[in-house]
A protein has these predicted regions:
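Flavin-dependent oxidoreductase catalytic cores
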Residues: 4, 10, 19-371
Length: 371
């Protein structure tokens, strides 16, 4: 059951006029450097959320326009790239960039160079859509934890209906783990500062973590330990290649898109987060569109659940403006805030927020080009 926290909207105070315990304006907190770990210090507490733009060139190679697009946003503390597919059958949307060929790696080098030239940092978000793929993209089977189809049609290609996937074998799961690790190494070769594992929003890793999409009875299903196994194997394999301090993961303990949640899912995420606490990750990034949503089986907001169960860096997201984000950080609800659509509409988002200038409202028509 999902409900809106309407009272929070009513009770938010103007953070620009509020003072922290140290006597500084709350908004100043957002613009101070933030130390993720011994390896990475960010210029500020803003992150650019991963935003699928479907603008890759032939061969799913990043373009010069993409390099310029990310470069214009390099003042954000950490950019997380649009989701990047780790192998051909990972694709579920048209023209989404890959990170499994040398041409793709070389294309991303232009992107990372554009960001680094302006002093920024950028992670690649590693992605496999699982049952949300379609043979149209790769002329191969659709693979998932279990043979449970997603109802509906493929976004931006509504003539394509989702198909019943084939359940992965354990040998195929082992290969996927290695493919994630290879993508992580490719990201470092391409100049990324690290990677974010996409384990949220109903895609492949998330499908293993929810009972509605994981009906397995082998080593990857049936109990919290087994249902968490794939996610942890991916984390460990990538960390072994590039270092855990350069690895973040995005999670959706509250199922809100592409799959259904159930009370039994709570035990899976309790177990998973306990194990992630033992690993030196850069951060966990909440996956949700609106952090006012609450989930009965989590006891409230997904962000509050993650804060209570994970001791490392937490990235909040979900319809936050700078003032609400600053207040939430001051209240220790999370450590950094990811901004999504406002950064599509405002490449100069950080400058405008600093100056208190009005932001250009986001509109879907803006998705037609990279500005």
């Amino acid at each position: 059951m999902q409900k809106r926290l309407a009272s929070e909207q009513k009770n938010v105070l103007n953070a620009r006029s509020r003072i922290t315990r140290s006597g500084q304006p709350i908004m100043n907190t957002l613009f101070q450097p933030y130390r993720l770990n011994d390896t990475l210090t960010l210029a500020n507490r803003f992150m650019m959320a991963p935003l699928t733009r479907c603008m890759a060139g032939p061969g799913l190679v990043p373009t010069e326009q993409m390099a310029a697009y990310y470069g214009r946003r390099a003042d954000i503390g950490l950019i997380v790239s649009e989701a990047v597919i780790i192998r051909p059958d990972a694709q579920g949307y048209p023209n989404t960039p890959g990170l499994f060929t040398q041409a793709q790696i070389d294309g991303w080098k232009k992107v990372t160079s554009a960001v680094h030239a302006k002093g920024g940092k950028i992670f690649a978000q590693l992605w496999h859509v699982g049952r949300l793929s379609h043979p149209f993209f790769h002329q191969a089977e659709v693979l998932a934890p279990s043979a449970v189809a997603h109802e509906g049609t493929v976004p931006r290609m509504r003539e394509l209906t989702y198909q019943v996937p084939r359940a992965l074998t354990e040998a195929e799961i082992a290969q996927l783990v290695q493919d994630y690790a290879t993508a992580g190494a490719n990201a470092i070769e391409a100049g990324f500062d690290g990677v974010e594992i996409h384990g949220a929003n109903g895609y492949l890793i998330d499908q293993f973590l929810h009972h509605s999409t994981n009906l397995r009875s082998d080593n990857y299903g049936g109990c919290p330990e087994n249902m968490s196994r794939f996610a942890l194997e991916v984390v460990d394999a990538i960390s072994a290649r590039i270092g855990g301090d350069r690895v973040g993961i995005r999670l959706s303990p509250g199922a809100y898109v592409h799959l259904a949640g159930s009370p039994e899912d709570r035990a899976v995420f309790d177990y998973l987060l306990g194990k992630l606490n033992d690993r030196p990750l850069a951060y966990i990034h909440l996956g949700i569109f609106d952090d006012n949503l609450t989930f009965d089986y989590l006891g409230g907001r997904a962000s509050d659940y993650l804060r209570a169960h994970y001791k490392g860096n937490l990235v909040g997201v979900g319809n936050y403006d700078a003032e609400r984000a600053a207040a939430a950080i001051e209240a220790n609800r999370f450590d950094l805030v990811a901004i999504g659509r406002p950064l599509i509409a405002n490449p100069d988002y950080l400058t405008k927020v600093k100056k208190g200038e009005a932001l250009v409202p986001y509109a879907d028509t803006m998705l037609a080009e990279l500005v």
